[in-house]
Amino acid sequence: MKQVPGYTLVRTEDCPEQHGTLTVLTHDVSGATILLVENEDNNKAFGIGFGTFPSDDTGVFHILEHSVLAGSEKYPVTSPFLQLLKSSMASFLNAMTFPDKTVYPFATPNETDFRNLMDVYLNAVFCPLAMVDRAVFEQEGWHRDADGTVSGVVYNEMQGALATPDAQLQNALERAMFPDTAYGFVSGGDPESIQALTYEKYQRVYRRHYSADNCCITLYGKMDMAEKLEMLDRDYLSRMPRTTTRPRLTVQDEQPGTCVELPYYTENPEPDEVQCALAWYTGAFADRERQLGVEILLDALLGTNNSPLKAALLAEKLGADIDMGFDDSTLQPTLELVLRGATEESARKFAPAVRKAVDDVLARGIPQELLLASLNSAEFASLERPGSLPDGVLDAINASTGWLHTGDPALLLHTDKLFASLRSKMADGWFDELLRSLFAPAPVQVLQVPTLPKKQEETQAPARTDAKLVLDHPLTVADLGEGAPSAAGQTEQVAGATVLRHPSAGSLYLNFYYDLGHVAPEDLPYLDLLTDVLDELDTPTHTAQQLNTLRSTWLGDSRVLLDFWTGRQEGAPCHAKLTMSLSLLERSLQKAVELGGEWLYDTQLTGPAAEAAFARVLSQQKLNMEQQFIQQGNAYAAVRASAHYNVENAASERCSGVSYYHFLCDLLEKADWAGLGAKLETLRAQVLQHAQLTVSLHGSEQALDTLRTLLPGSRFAAQERDAAQPYAEPLTPPVNEAFIIDGGVNYAVQVWPMERRSDRKVLARVMSYEYLWHNIREVGGAYGTGMLSSDGVEYLYTYRDPHLTESYDTFAKGPAELAARDYTEKDLNDLIVGAVAKLDTPRKPRAEARELDRQYFCGITEAMKAADRKALCAVDAARLKEQAAGLADAMAAGVKVTFGSRDAVEAAGSLFDRVETL
């Protein structure tokens, strides 16, 4: 690009990985580093990241992350971030505290929105009111009330975040590995230490770290870069001279052989719930080839239960599961292995068992086909960039990471040459030597033993008020446009299956949908279990490990799952599907059909190997669900409560909720693995041989031609299949339930049935952002709260909430308050813009493929989507007040479900008809 006044050009380079050009600049006055990623992506992104290095466990940088978004000089309102959530078209809007940096990114497809958001973010980080308003610190960080109780948004968030044994184990491991550097501290904050943070220290830390020469700014996508740089210089950077000393990270002397023991407090300590973590340093961050090699090596040796190293360790029967973790984003990357579900005696044998297993792998040599499969899989993922984060947000985070550790914000955006180099080294023993060097030092070790819990304190927080955010160029409903139509699909019959094709370029997405309308409700959990055990099972021609290797070699991603979808019309049926979802390059289509058929049809569900796999997988699933109840209790409560009101949620709860947890516990207690295998075999045959099959292809016309020739000779061909039918099951009467979990926080949910009306999404946004945010989050101290309206139900929820009864009382008062409010034209405009923007959020190709398939099965047409959009845009004050007035009766007919602490549940008394300890 052309030279822009005020900046020094460091370099410009082509970047095929980003489909565009990278430009690195330094701002002359402030010393800020800027990365421009210029390409044709309309989902434009911005990010500003600061190096933030904790020196204690007070969570000061986490509190600052929250605080700077709570009002600034140009936008002097309590929560501009909240008001942006209401009225922006952003596809991503957030901030993140990492162990060594804090990043403020957003993405939006709208140019006016981009300029507004960029100015709000820059004013927030460089001119926050929190530096002169102590109330912000107390609200977002911590405060003590007159009765001595402690609260605050971050304080309460971290009580929940650190409630799980995994979080406590991780923090202890990091302290043991990094006793002398920033990485040894809890960057999010430990509740026991947060109270030691003073307002004066908070101010000092901000001034030292939130300087322009300690930041990296990223601009990504299709935009006028020169215009954005001029705004940066004119309004912010030119006013910020360089500081004398920029904060720096220090390197930790490695700590091999360190051993730590710690308790984990739980309501029901069991001798077989011990965990043991082992960790090693993996080399220098700047050596990106080595770190990518570590990632590939670990996936090859530990990626599945049948991978050589993990299989050998599981065979020792030291515990129920072994997890692997690898973090290459820090100055000193690390890997860790965690043994779960062990006894104290077996946990102490873990380190020697790892040493022996590594030596055995080295003695035999690492199988080349495993390395190739893992390398191919990693390379496909780097091209596809799966997940929900917009590409520009990922680039902003990666730019901040590379800049922080090497001074080069573009370092992590180049990967093609790394993959090529590693591919050339596969046959020369490079990976064997890498494995040897990784595990040669004695590991850092942490042993975690369960014991009875400490008593938790009750907490609460004070009330605050708010004003309206005034933007230079606010969005209006007129800016929204008509919405882009989805690509039209075409169907045809091939080999007894319906083939649905949507045109797309790039990677192929191939989905096989088997109708489950004929399946009895009590059999659904078995099918869900089937989707989880397929990776563990042999076929007549391949071992499980061989088949996993082939799938990784030829496919980008492959998974089997259950889908439950319901249309938008009132009384619309539920469509239940057993789904195999594959992503691949077009040249691999034949292999995809062959491998997918073998994997789905030929895995052996009976015999000793299958029975051992069942016991292993069920134990692992049970452990994982117990962790998730503590971390995501609101999600489990919502699906549990919603199951009383529609079939889709009833099926989801049966296959992924508390009912499924009970199903797992029952199977583990019975341990009839032969009977389980026979049951799964019968169900699989019933579905795969007889259920209607729809094959969805998102790809080119040429790929469709190839698929037409492949299906008739494949396992998916059938002469005759049953007609599809809606899935149905009887709904159970509503019951108010509480589930007691470990930890000092609660998740309160209230659900009620409601007709499907798109315009109620505006009401949900008013409730979420005008009422609940203030009363539950700011006053009550919960980390999260909101209202959702979808799928024939509506619900209110809290997340990591110090309260329970008080939150339900707040829920009950909401309808009257919303009905009594006056809504200005600007209020309605902002709410409608935010609601409609959710319809236009850009999706990545895989997500777009799945959404188009959902629309096909549910009969969702362009006319329906246009009608939804029109209804949202037509909401007026009278309609909103009418909906709010009717909400109280609707809520009263609903149900309450809570996941929470014993103290809170017992204090709630008569709120619940049934209480269970999980």
Protein language model features and the residues they cover:
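Non-catalytic terminal extensions that flank enzyme cores
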Residues: M1-A45
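Hydrophobic, small-residue-rich alpha-helical packing segments that form membrane-like cores
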Residues: R144-A212, T218-G221, M225-D233, M240-Y265, ...
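Extended, domain-scale alpha-helical bundle/helix-rich regions
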Residues: A427-K454
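M16 family metallopeptidases and their MPP-like homologs
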Residues: N43-F53, S79-C127, R134-E140, A167-E192, ...
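Generic recognition of flexible, low-complexity loop/linker segments
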Residues: F92, Q203-R207, P263-T266, L309, ...
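His/Glu-based metal-binding/catalytic segments typifying zinc-dependent metallopeptidases
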Residues: V37-E40, G47-G49, Y155, Q159, ...
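Non-catalytic, conformational "gating/processing" segments within enzyme and secreted inhibitor domains
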Residues: E200-D235, S652, G657, L676-L711, ...
